[in-house]
Amino acid sequence: MRIILITGISGSGKSVALNVLEDAGYYCVDNLPAQFIPDLACYLADQGYSQLGVATDIRSRESLARLPDTVRELAANHQVQVLYLTASTDALVQRYSETRRRHPLSAQVDVGAAAGTPNDTSLIEAIEKERELLSPLAESAHRIDTSNVRTNTLRSWIKELIQDENENKNSQQLTLLFESFGFKHGVPSDADLVFDVRSLPNPYYDLALRPLTGRDAPVIDFLQSQPMVLAMAEDIRAYVEKWLPSFIADNRSYLTVTIGCTGGQHRSVFIAERLANYFRAHGNVLVRHRELAPAG
């Protein structure tokens, strides 16, 4: 059975991710304590199910410490993947303000507040407390930073992860994820490697290229004509290729390589696509452009 466990910070999009799994045919359960997952997997396997999605988070606080042991137990008989969703504190505060919902830990840090009344100070304390409690889980999971991500973009990312795992379900290879981003929107917190390409010639200053992206032919032609761009792309490729065996030896499932320019529209997109095209010949590769709307 293939099992995807979704955990992470409250308000980061776990419900969206679980809904994508459900739409993809997974048997999904929300807020299930970790100690019950093996029995559920066994029961569903006996019933003929082959895919299970489970969300577990701070609401099942007492059982979260058992999750690493549960994952090891499940991995003995099943294909298991853990997704950890997170977001910046500012993004989470804004989301809670918009929905008027209370954080699961709010009662512990703001017992005097009226029910249903957001309090930025206590909310920030609750978010940081949750981040601290969940930090051990983030270290061993595939992290997804949703800070500047629209809901439809997150759905597309989860679909890509599912598709990648389906295509490589019998493979133990590490998956390389190349992600472009704009520094003005913040560095992705799920990055394993961060490369800054802001020193490269910028197509933004060409009015004909400004509305385009690094996936469009005119921008590609412009950047490919710049020796500095090609040299930096080659240096990044060489670095990743040299150290990739070390990351594989560390038993990682994913390595997230992020490339940032100023706005995340041109240079970083071009470099990410170029690297992805090269490394596809070496194994499992995904490419993601945080600041661009998903295709289609």
UniProtKB/Swiss-Prot annotation:
- This protein's UniProt keywords: ATP-binding, GTP-binding, Nucleotide-binding
Q: Which SUPFAM superfamilies match?
A: P-loop containing nucleoside triphosphate hydrolases (SSF52540)
Q: Does the keyword Cytoplasm apply?
A: no
Positions annotated to bind GTP: 57-60
Q: Which InterPro entries match?
A: P-loop_NTPase (IPR027417), RapZ-like (IPR005337), RapZ-like_N (IPR053930), RapZ_C (IPR053931)
Q: Which residues of the sequence carry a binding annotation for ATP?
A: 8-15
Which GO molecular function annotations are given, in alphabetical order?
ATP binding; GTP binding
NCBIfam families in the record: PRK05416.1
Q: What does this protein do?
A: Displays ATPase and GTPase activities.
What the record says about family reads: Belongs to the RapZ-like family.
Q: What is this protein called?
A: Nucleotide-binding protein Rmet_0297
Q: Which organism is it from?
A: Cupriavidus metallidurans (strain ATCC 43123 / DSM 2839 / NBRC 102507 / CH34) (Ralstonia metallidurans)
